[in-house]
Amino acid sequence: MSWIEPIISHFCQDLGVPTSSPLSPLIQLEMAQSGTLQLEQHGATLTLWLARSLAWHQCEDAMVKALTLTAAQKSGALPLRAGWLGENQLVLFVSLDERSLTLPLLHQAFEQLLRLQQEVLAP
């Protein structure tokens, strides 16, 4: 069992999702309002991915906003990044060094992804 598993498990429980032990290196949670949240462990990094399908008419504006808001000078405390999957799926993500991972940092990263998603989708 990795030392960060209890942190990830507690985070999932805080979101109302029970977990089993041992945790998979890829956890996928369906969020009612914000799409799919994935937590992926790879090497010494934990990446949080927030993916949401958009209507075709939202895609261009969302892509421009996401890239603008995640530019290095505007990314804030955590290095948030944006990407696109397929024809209509906005993907926002942040990679965290496992050595500095704490439960508050995990919550902060998730909250920043949610805020960024709201900003990107705002009219």
Curated annotation (Swiss-Prot):
Signal peptide (residue range): none
Q: Name one GO cellular component term.
A: cytoplasm
Q: Which cysteines are joined by disulfide bonds?
A: none
Q: Any keyword Cytoplasm?
A: yes
Q: Pfam families from the entry?
A: Type_III_SycN
**Gene3D superfamilies the record matches:** 3.30.1460.10
Might you name a Gene Ontology BP term for this protein? protein secretion
Keyword vocabulary terms for this entry: Cell inner membrane, Cell membrane, Chaperone, Cytoplasm, Membrane, Plasmid
Impact upon substituting A77T: In plasmid pYVa127/90
**Membrane topology term:** Peripheral membrane protein
Q: Which CDD domains match?
A: T3SC_IA_SycN-like
- Role description: Functions as a specific chaperone for YopN. It could facilitate the secretion and the subsequent translocation of YopN.
Protein name per UniProt: Chaperone protein SycN
UniProt organism field:
Yersinia enterocolitica
